Amino acid sequence: MERFIENAMYASRWLLAPIYFGLSLGLLALALKFFQEVIHLLPSVFSMAESELILVLLSLIDMALVGGLLVMVMISGYENFVSQLDIDDNKEKLNWLGTMDSSSLKMKVAASIVAISSIHLLRIFMDAKNVDPQHLMWYVIIHMTFVVSAFAMGYLDKVTKH
């Protein structure tokens, strides 16, 4: 009975595979949205104000960071919890494949969230005159919460490894 339960629990990790594949569909949706923004940007690039262009570019950077986060979670999560990726030797291989454990993945995710939050906050600051000061304060508080959380996670990870 114990062996059956252990085998069933171990096999249940495969339930994560469609979830990680679903993230690739989310990445596809993000890529479509990215290029939709680029297509909207190109015809009006010469007529828009510099600050407006910067806001659009920050939005594109934001999407790129989220895309990188999706790839990182999708691939390293699959490798850590489901199965090793069997990539042909003749194909281009990401240098971090097989090296990111769940602890380093958490740190990369935390750093990505802080970067995404920073971009979002910068976009808000560029339009600060149209943002309620109360909302602005909460944006900063939430961002600082992300920063402090990432720092605390890094510190705790360093302390527990040594």
From Swiss-Prot:
Disulfide bond positions: none
Membrane topology: Multi-pass membrane protein
Record carries keyword Transmembrane: yes
KW Ligase (keyword) present: no
Chief localization: membrane
Pfam families for this protein: UPF0114
One Gene Ontology CC term in the entry: plasma membrane
Keywords on record: Cell membrane, Membrane, Transmembrane, Transmembrane helix
Protein's cellular compartments: Cell membrane
Transmembrane intervals: 15-35, 53-73, 136-156
InterPro entries, per database record: UPF0114, UPF0114_bac
Family label: Belongs to the UPF0114 family.
HAMAP family: UPF0114
Name assigned to this protein: UPF0114 protein PFLU_5318
Organism (species): Pseudomonas fluorescens (strain SBW25)
